[in-house]
């Protein structure tokens, strides 16, 4: 199976550089690394250029028009050629078996939800200043490297556990619902909308617990000024089981 790793980022090249370094440590190299950039400055573009000889990077950039994570991810999906799509945020470090385990646990008709642990501000500074190596961040972690059966299948009720900082699913399941809804602007609930529409389409949730987890670098909280608007939009999706396709998406059939 061909694998695309889609990394969202916005004006945080130091964190993105650390994330890309964690990609180089993977036991299973992704076939595509698609950086989904929500309008960063030229500094991020320069960083990506410095990695082109080490990773199969494709750059998907949208102009800076507020927080538009949905549009950014959809552009990355559009550019991808792989069967399996793995989504992470540009401040989430991956342990060496991350891609390998996502592939082992992946199954058409399921979205795999991975976990995370939050790094403190001091831990994050140590990592970004390279006082601590990326490999040592996960030095004492013990990961399960096998599917472990049906206990991972959570059905459709555990959707609140699914975060786009660490999830994977097959491309066909993503495209069937036209990806992420680009009518969500600003922080909040575009990922929950995505998961609920997947469930409405028949996709089930699988747990990646104890198998795939990321180290989420510390960052200041994003503005919540549009959360109430996004919440109203999400409630419509949540209560309408016929709502499957994104209201607005470049992936519309």
Predicted regions mapped to residue ranges:
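Short, acidic, metal-binding catalytic loop of nucleotide-sugar glycosyltransferases
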Residues: 21-30
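Cell-envelope/extracellular polymer assembly enzymes that use nucleotide-activated donors
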Residues: 2-4, 32, 193
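A conserved acidic beta->alpha catalytic loop
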Residues: 29, 37-46, 92
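Short, flexible, basic/aromatic active-site loop/helix in glycosyltransferases
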Residues: 132-160
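Glycine-rich, basic loop-to-helix element that forms the pyrophosphate-binding segment
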Residues: 63-80, 97
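Conserved donor NDP-sugar-binding/catalytic core segment of glycosyltransferases
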Residues: 97-133
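Short aromatic/hydrophobic "clamp" motif used to bind/position activated sugar donors
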Residues: 85
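A short, conserved alpha-helix in the catalytic core of glycosyltransferases
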Residues: 161-162, 166-178, 185-204, 209-210
């Amino acid at each position: 199976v061909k694998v695309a790793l889609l990394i969202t980022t916005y004006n945080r090249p130091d964190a993105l550089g650390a994330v890309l370094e964690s990609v180089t440590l993977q036991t299973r190299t992704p076939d595509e690394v698609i950086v989904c950039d929500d309008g960063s400055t030229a500094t991020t573009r320069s960083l990506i250029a410095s990695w082109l000889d080490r990773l199969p990077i494709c750059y998907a950039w949208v102009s800076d028009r507020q927080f538009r994570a949905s549009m950014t991810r959809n552009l990355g999906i559009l550019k991808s050629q792989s069967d399996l799509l793995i989504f992470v945020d540009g401040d989430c470090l991956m342990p060496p078996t991350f891609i390998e385990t996502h592939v082992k646990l992946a199954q058409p008709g399921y979205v795999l939800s991975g976990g995370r642990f939050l790094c403190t501000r001091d831990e994050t500074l140590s990592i970004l200043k390279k006082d601590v190596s990326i490999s040592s961040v996960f030095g004492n972690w013990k990961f399960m490297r096998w599917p472990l059966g049906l206990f991972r299948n959570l059905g459709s009720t555990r959707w609140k556990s699914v975060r786009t900082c660490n999830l994977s699913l097959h491309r066909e399941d993503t495209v069937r619902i036209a990806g992420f809804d680009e009518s969500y602007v600003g922080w909040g609930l575009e990922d929950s909308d995505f998961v609920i529409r997947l469930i409405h389409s028949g996709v089930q949730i699988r747990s990646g617990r104890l198998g795939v987890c990321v180290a989420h670098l510390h960052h200041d909280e994003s503005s919540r000024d549009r959360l109430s608007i996004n919440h109203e939009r999400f409630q419509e999706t949540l209560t309408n089981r016929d709502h499957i396709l994104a209201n607005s998406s470049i992936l519309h059939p």
